[in-house]
Amino acid sequence: MRGLVTAVRTLTVLPVPGKEAERFSSALFWFPVVGLFLGLLQAGAGYLAMLSGWPELAASMVLIAGVLLTRGMHADGFADMADGFFGGRDRESRLRIMKDPSVGSFGAIGLILLFLFKSIVLVKLLAFGLYPWIVSGVLLARLVQVALASMLPYARREGGTAAGFVEGAGIQHFVAAFLVALFILLLLMNGEMLPSGIGLSAAIAGAVLMSLLTIKKIGGVTGDVLGASSEFTEVLVWVSGVFLALCS
């Protein structure tokens, strides 16, 4: 269970007793489980806020819960990646910019657009009562983190925060996490193959797009890239849920 302790401490602000795993890569198996827990809390916040009959307020509560539960670290990674990828001219300058704790213009604009778009999509999900899709987005976002950590090299030669997860990870970690995530996803979707397949396809698309982009820009992944991939995947899965509802 040390892997679970490491996963919870890495992905959330929640204090948990116990010792962490000696190999951080062993925590990757638990990422979808932690994603399920986070998703349930965020969806629960949205459900309670929807009792007011105000979808916009409920969408804000979902986002606020997500930021508070994760220290906003994935959003921070998204901002850092936006600054580095669009502000740097070469691999080294991009990595240097991403390591800078300050937020630049690309990062600020990216965050504004990210949360604006998330809010719009969440309003629709909440109005339709699609709470399983909210949870699924958070769940699959953590699966994509495992996919990138397991299949791509670490970009920084000097190491970094996520190096322990990436350098010790292999395809077996992804396969195990994938099976766990798929089982949970099917439960959330009441065993229905169409919504499960669409949600999973959106997550796969997010993983592929992020992989192609980060390999082109910096030749691998960093902690910021893993965080950004989580944010990007949440959006894709939530959007796919809205489109499925509109087409039904």
From Swiss-Prot:
Pathway: Cofactor biosynthesis; adenosylcobalamin biosynthesis; adenosylcobalamin from cob(II)yrinate a,c-diamide: step 7/7
EC nos: 2.7.8.26
Molecular function per GO: adenosylcobinamide-GDP ribazoletransferase activity; cobalamin 5'-phosphate synthase activity
Localisation per UniProt entry: Cell inner membrane
Main location: membrane
GO cellular component annotations of the record: plasma membrane
Lipid biosynthesis keyword on record: no
Class of the enzyme per the UniProt entry, highest EC level: transferase
Keyword annotations of the record: Cell inner membrane, Cell membrane, Cobalamin biosynthesis, Magnesium, Membrane, Transferase, Transmembrane, Transmembrane helix
Gene Ontology biological process: cobalamin biosynthetic process
Membrane topology: Multi-pass membrane protein
Record flagged with keyword Coiled coil: no
Ranges annotated as spanning the membrane: 28-48, 103-123, 126-146, 169-189, 193-213, 225-245
Listed InterPro entries: CobS (IPR003805)
PANTHER family, A to Z: ADENOSYLCOBINAMIDE-GDP RIBAZOLETRANSFERASE
Protein family membership: Belongs to the CobS family.
Record function comment: Joins adenosylcobinamide-GDP and alpha-ribazole to generate adenosylcobalamin (Ado-cobalamin). Also synthesizes adenosylcobalamin 5'-phosphate from adenosylcobinamide-GDP and alpha-ribazole 5'-phosphate.
Protein's recorded name: Adenosylcobinamide-GDP ribazoletransferase
